[in-house]
Structure formats: structure tokens, C-alpha cells
């Protein structure tokens, strides 16, 4: 186990002290008694070989881990262990489904279900049936060994607000839906990052047969629409991965786990529109971080081979 001590400093000032494993970040504490957390791997991922890991989400003690194409693996989390339940294809499985972000809604499809509906971000450069950057709404079975596509959500942009891909995340506490993405792409020097906000759509549970209902969102439905750089010009463009909203904070793991693009956890204050924290994860984790989720009061982060637990103290 590696213990990391965190102290508040100026915005975006992250300094590593290798001898003591200290990292510095700005802003108020993340609802923690001390600016301190421990980081430890709680288990190796056991999904489908040769597929990159993408989205991850948790509900109670259960973890849903996604891979390219829409392969899913479920686990039971035991605090320091992860026990595999099953691996299966999502109902939205396909070569144009990156499954980049997994985010549970606050709505259950049926009282029998153990998990609410799962929102899966397509986040692919190409469209599926004329639809791009859609949200696939999945109903995980009670035994957590299969899933069914029950709806799609599409944002129909009129003014080309986003560039290559768009990621979606649910604010379950306040019932909002956020979209985050590049205006161009990460490799372009003129790229910016846009955040949009909608009321969380309600999914119809009456649809039957093979007709998958499609919910269309338009710019008329926007509650918020702004560029991160308008409020934080120093926001650094790096490869962005998963998203999580908790207590009004948007958690964004970015980077590739390399020296040129170190793994970092950005924490964006949604109400104040400010970068509250930027935490260097490069020595407490290894490789690319793909998504994060709150699980039983702890922050879990998925990499390309393991699940890490960050316990704030």
C-alpha cells in the first residue's frame, strides 16, 4: 500500500517529492477530514483478452467494467478484493461502440432489477445508423451476466459544439446529465473543452419488441453550455477518459500514464465553474486510467489491468 499526503497550494501547482510520495493540489478538501489518501490495487481485471478497458461504474458492492465494442464484466467488490461474476456483450455491442464511460442513472427499469439503468457513452468517431456520440441505455440482468439495450439518447447539435467524440455522465443526486468533450481533438493546438448540461431524461419502460426508443436532445434543452477554458485558461488538453459526478464535483481522469502525458485526476467544481483540484496519479498508479466510480464510500479507478482504491482519510 502506498500512502500519499496532499497539501493545498496554488491552482494547478502539482509538485512530486519522490522520497516522501507527496503531491500538491489546490482548493478545498474533497469532503475529507485530512488532505490524505491511501492508494492500493484491489485486484486484476479479468475481462476479454486483447480488448482495451474503457468505462467502469459501481452500484452498492457491484462493479461493471466495460471494454472496447461493449464487452462487459461484472465483479463483486469486497473492500480489498474483486470477485468476477460474469463476462457478456452489452445489448449495444458493436465495432463502433467504444463504451468509453459507464454511468448509472437514478432510474430502475423494474423493481426486480438490482441495478438502475446504465448509460454507456458510444464516444466513437463514426456514427451508428446515422447516430453519433449517442448514449446506449442498458438494463443489466438480475444475475449480472447479461444486458439488454432499452433506449438510446442522442444530442442533435445544430452548431457543431463538439469535435471528435463526446462523453456522458449522470449526476444521480441532482438528476442531471452532463456531456463533456473536445471542440476539435486533443492533438489540435486550438482545441478547447466544452461542458453541457441537461435535465436527466426519463426512460420509457413500456417499449416492447425490437423497436428501441430514441430520445433526442437538442440545443433548446440545454441548461448550461460553456468552455472550460473560459473559466480556467490553464486547463491542459490531454487525453480524457472516464467521468464521475459526486457532491457537485466532476472527476476526470486524464493522461496516458506516460512521462509526456502523466495520469492526472482533474476535479471540476460544477457550481463554481472552477478547477478545484488536479491530483498527480503518476506514481500511485500505473498506466492509463480509464474511468472512476464511487463504491461504498471509496473512489475506485480502473486502469488497463487493475482496479485501484483511493481511500480518503
Each predicted region: which residue ranges?
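Beta-strand-rich domains and repeat architectures in extracellular enzymes and scaffolds
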Residues: 40-70
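Sec-dependent N-terminal signal peptides
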Residues: 4-13
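Recurrent small/Gly-Pro-centered beta-turn motifs in extracellular repeat architectures
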Residues: 60, 66-68, 120-124, 179-183, ...
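Blade-level signature of beta-propeller repeat domains, shared across WD40, Kelch, NHL, RCC1
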Residues: 286-313
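Structural motif
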Residues: 70-76, 115, 126-140, 185-200, ...
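Loop/turn-rich, solvent-exposed surfaces of beta-rich toroidal or solenoidal domains
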Residues: 221-270
Amino acid at each position: 500500500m502506498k500512502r500519499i499526503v496532499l497539501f493545498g497550494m496554488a491552482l494547478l501547482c502539482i509538485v512530486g517529492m519522490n522520497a516522501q510520495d507527496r503531491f500538491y493540489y489546490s482548493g478545498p478538501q474533497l469532503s475529507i477530514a485530512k488532505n490524505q489518501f491511501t492508494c492500493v490495487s484491489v485486484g486484476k481485471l479479468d475481462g476479454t483478452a486483447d480488448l482495451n478497458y474503457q468505462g467502469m461504474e459501481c452500484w452498492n458492492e457491484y462493479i461493471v467494467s466495460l471494454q472496447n465494442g461493449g464487452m462487459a464484466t461484472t465483479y463483486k467488490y469486497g473492500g480489498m478484493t474483486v470477485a468476477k461474476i460474469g463476462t457478456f456483450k452489452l445489448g449495444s455491442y458493436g465495432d463502433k461502440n467504444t463504451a468509453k464511460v459507464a454511468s448509472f442513472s437514478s432510474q430502475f427499469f423494474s423493481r426486480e432489477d438490482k441495478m438502475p439503468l446504465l448509460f454507456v457513452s458510444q464516444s466513437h468517431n463514426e456514427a451508428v445508423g446515422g447516430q453519433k456520440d449517442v448514449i446506449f441505455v442498458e438494463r443489466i440482468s438480475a444475475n449480472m451476466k447479461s444486458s439488454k439495450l432499452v433506449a438510446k439518447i442522442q444530442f442533435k447539435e445544430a452548431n457543431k459544439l463538439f469535435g471528435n467524440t463526446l462523453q456522458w455522465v449522470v449526476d444521480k443526486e441532482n438528476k442531471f446529465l452532463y456531456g463533456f468533450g473536445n471542440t476539435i481533438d486533443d492533438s489540435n493546438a486550438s482545441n478547447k473543452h466544452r461542458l453541457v448540461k441537461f435535465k436527466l431524461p426519463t426512460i420509457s419502460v413500456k417499449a416492447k419488441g425490437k423497436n428501441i426508443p430514441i430520445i433526442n436532445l437538442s440545443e433548446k434543452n440545454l441548461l448550461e453550455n460553456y468552455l472550460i477554458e473560459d473559466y480556467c485558461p490553464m486547463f491542459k488538453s490531454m487525453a480524457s477518459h472516464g467521468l464521475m459526478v459526486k457532491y457537485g464535483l466532476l472527476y476526470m481522469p486524464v493522461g496516458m500514464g506516460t512521462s509526456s502525458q502523466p495520469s492526472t485526476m482533474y476535479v471540476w467544481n460544477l457550481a463554481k465553474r472552477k478547477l478545484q483540484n488536479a491530483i498527480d496519479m503518476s506514481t500511485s498508479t500505473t498506466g492509463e486510467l480509464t474511468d472512476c466510480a464511487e463504491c461504498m464510500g471509496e473512489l475506485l479507478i480502473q486502469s488497463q489491468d487493475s482496479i485501484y482504491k483511493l481511500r480518503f482519510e
